[in-house]
Swiss-Prot record:
Involved in DNA repair and RecF pathway recombination. This is DNA repair protein RecO. GO terms for cellular component: bacterial nucleoid. Keywords: DNA damage, DNA recombination, DNA repair. GO terms for biological process: DNA recombination; double-strand break repair. Belongs to the RecO family. SUPFAM superfamilies: ArfGap/RecO-like zinc finger, Nucleic acid-binding proteins. It comes from Synechococcus sp. (strain WH7803). The keyword Cell division does not apply. Gene3D superfamilies: Nucleic acid-binding proteins, Recombination protein O, C-terminal domain.
């Protein structure tokens, strides 16, 4: 049929549309973020009822003007296991919101879908082990935020002072040293008045390692950095997103509230 096309991508958000339909927000390598009507998806036993958030879908879509409609769908991968833990579910929702804020319709961001799926895979592995440390979930969502912001063109400027251009080289061991987080500008050397946050040398060094593929760990495999530091880096992400993105990423606050209250691990300082 004229106007039919196939789309593959990740369902970021699904909401009601009228009495029986759903509105699907899909992240695709081909078209960026696109909104699609899913007719009858809210009816019992609908063949399109599998259009749910955090699911990779293969879609047959009809219509190129206005709100296109899903004619058929096939589930390629479901991340429903994320719901086994509140922290992993909140983190996944934050990544979905961040992707919506970073990508426009008909303006795909190369590599963003792949990066989101990599981090969802990591979160789902955590969700399968209820006893796994909450700190790993927190660190994963912070690192994922750093990766997605960089891919979307809003990366944190981690290597140079936003005021002087001098290198941001943390002097490990000099605990009086500080750099300031200025959400509208970047990171600046020194403890500046009006800074949203200040980082000490070890906090900045940890932040500068996050663009790498893997989480920073000690030689024994334990995660680097105590929970208060990771919560501080999450707060940095929140204020950076508020200052630069066209829409809020509200689930980051849910992640913060959820993980602030989680029990500390055995090796975590109190």
């Amino acid at each position: 049929m004229s106007g039919d096309r196939r789309l593959q991508g990740l369902a970021l958000k699904v909401g009601p549309l009228g009495e029986h339909d759903r509105l699907l927000t899909l992240l695709s390598d081909d078209v960026g973020v696109v909104r699609l009507a899913v007719p009858g998806a809210r009816r019992p036993r609908s063949s399109l009822a599998a259009a749910v958030p955090l699911t990779c879908l293969d879609l047959q879509v009809v219509g190129r003007r206005g709100l296109a409609r899903v004619r058929q769908l096939r589930v390629l991968r479901s991340y429903s296991g994320l719901g086994q833990r509140l922290d992993t579910l909140a983190s996944a929702q934050a990544l979905a919101e961040l992707a919506i804020a970073l990508v426009s319709s008909d303006d795909p961001v190369p590599g963003l879908l792949e990066a989101v799926l990599i981090h969802l895979d990591r979160l789902e592995r955590l969700s399968r082990t209820p006893g796994e440390e909450a700190d790993l979930c927190l660190a994963n969502v912070v690192q994922a935020g750093v990766h997605l912001l960089a891919l979307g063109g809003y990366g944190l400027p981690l290597q140079a002072c936003c005021r002087s251009g001098a290198a941001l080289t943390p002097p490990i061991g000099q605990w009086e040293w500080r750099c300031s987080v200025l959400p509208e500008e970047g990171l600046a050397l020194g403890a500046l008045a009006g800074a949203r946050l200040q980082l000490n040398p070890s906090e900045l060094a940890l932040l500068q390692r996050l663009p790498r593929p893997d989480l920073p760990r000690r030689s024994n495999g334990e995660l680097l950095g105590p929970r208060p530091v990771w919560l501080k880096l999450l707060a940095l992400l929140e204020c950076w997103c508020r200052a630069h993105l066209p829409r809020p990423v509200r689930s980051l606050a849910m992640v913060r509230d959820c993980l602030s209250a989680a029990p500390l691990s055995d090796h975590e300082p109190t």
